[in-house]
Amino acid sequence: MTQLSAAQKPSDSSKALYGGKGTRRITIRDITTAKERGEKWPMLTAYDAMTASVFDEAGIPVMLVGDSAGNCHLGYETTVPVTLDEMTMLSAAVVRGTSRALIVGDLPFGSYQEGPVQALRSATRLVKEAGVGAVKLEGGERSHRQIELLVESGIPVMAHIGLTPQSVNAMGYRVQGRGEEAAQQLLRDAKAVQDAGAFAVVLELVPAELAAEVTRVLHIPTVGIGAGPETDAQVLVWTDMLGLTGGKVPKFVKKYADLREVMGNAAKAFAEDVVGGTFPLEEHSVH
């Protein structure tokens, strides 16, 4: 009889992160055991209660309140200007809009770079004031001490290596880990965050072959975005995934809808009804 690999074995439907029967909050233990079962899982960004509630009802097990909100919702050109106050407000809204998903709050630029103590203060705000179940921060070896202190203090950490958008002024937007030296550094970063206690690590804009190697080497889950199909999980920015983002989107994005067109057409139809005197009608009026 042919033996199925761990990745091919069907997950216990009652324990599956996506499509599972449970109604309680997803925990860090659920995430780590999913890798042990060879179960892949999806993650989406969310920045408000209403959107988060839709994704929660759809069964998305993990949501990231990313500082990508700076680009997607707050009108900034990069993620760099996003503040901890803004991330706390957005994270709290997403927590309120969900009942099952694990909510991960991003630590924005300037909220942890000074060192472990600053990182702990910032992460504590997201946990206490917003109610997130974990925090995310960028950096591999350079963030080792911050991750270590947060984990020692009882705050779960999702790390983020490869392309780190908060470092755009230094790194630019380009693929990370190409070439032997860069690949070895990314592997060192991945092992460093695992050793520091991170429960998962995001790999952004990394060659697929390198991301696959990192996934094999680590015992914690890898979350890919532009990192090929072999990572343990995949994440997309929801406005990209649903076609709300205007202009060109990254190559790694798959659009599952075209909300920008749907919303634009609906707004035009409303405007034309108002101008033409066909809204509101009697059925929309009160007496």
From Swiss-Prot:
Cofactor binding, note field: Binds 1 Mg(2+) ion per subunit.
Top class in the EC scheme: transferase
Principal cellular location given in the protein's record: cytoplasm
Subunit details: Homodecamer; pentamer of dimers.
Pfam family, one: Pantoate_transf
Organism: Streptomyces avermitilis (strain ATCC 31267 / DSM 46492 / JCM 5070 / NBRC 14893 / NCIMB 12804 / NRRL 8165 / MA-4680)
Pathway participation: Cofactor biosynthesis; (R)-pantothenate biosynthesis; (R)-pantoate from 3-methyl-2-oxobutanoate: step 1/2
GO biological process, one term: pantothenate biosynthetic process
Residues the entry annotates as binding 3-methyl-2-oxobutanoate: D67, S68, D106, K136
Molecular functions per Gene Ontology: 3-methyl-2-oxobutanoate hydroxymethyltransferase activity; magnesium ion binding
UniProt binding sites for Mg(2+): D67, D106, E138
Active site: E204 (proton acceptor)
Enzyme Commission no: 2.1.2.11
Record flagged with keyword Nucleotide-binding: no
Co-factor requirement: Mg(2+)
Entry's Gene Ontology cellular component terms: cytoplasm
Reaction catalysis annotation: 3-methyl-2-oxobutanoate + (6R)-5,10-methylene-5,6,7,8-tetrahydrofolate + H2O = 2-dehydropantoate + (6S)-5,6,7,8-tetrahydrofolate
Superkingdom: Bacteria
Function: Catalyzes the reversible reaction in which hydroxymethyl group from 5,10-methylenetetrahydrofolate is transferred onto alpha-ketoisovalerate to form ketopantoate.
Keyword annotations: Cytoplasm, Magnesium, Metal-binding, Pantothenate biosynthesis, Transferase
Family assignment from sequence similarity: Belongs to the PanB family.
Subcellular location: Cytoplasm
Record's protein name: 3-methyl-2-oxobutanoate hydroxymethyltransferase
HAMAP family: PanB (MF_00156)
